[in-house]
């Protein structure tokens, strides 16, 4: 089954030709984490965006350092499934 989550433009951190870097929302258990999602599964709908995924989708969440010297270093990494992602955005 396919799922769709609506996000704000503020949750889009970066975009390339093939993928979009999405920030997790602030009041979730993964505040500060980001993940890459295929661009073909991200749609602009007015001022909001949606990203779609199916039940088998696995998300690799990464948290980067905040300092001047470690801003490109992954300081923590978590993997969650489709149900975990739905639960985080439902908070």
Model-assigned labels for residue ranges:
Residues 1-91:
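Conserved active-site motif detector
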């Amino acid at each position: 089954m396919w799922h769709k989550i609506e996000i704000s433009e503020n949750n889009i951190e970066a975009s390339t030709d093939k993928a979009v870097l999405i920030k997790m929302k602030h009041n979730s258990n993964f505040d500060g984490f980001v993940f890459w999602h295929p661009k073909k599964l991200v749609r602009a709908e007015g001022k909001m965006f949606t990203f779609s995924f199916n039940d088998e989708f696995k998300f690799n969440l990464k948290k980067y350092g905040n300092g001047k010297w470690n801003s490109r270093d992954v300081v923590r990494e978590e993997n969650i499934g489709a149900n975990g992602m739905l639960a985080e955005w439902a908070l």
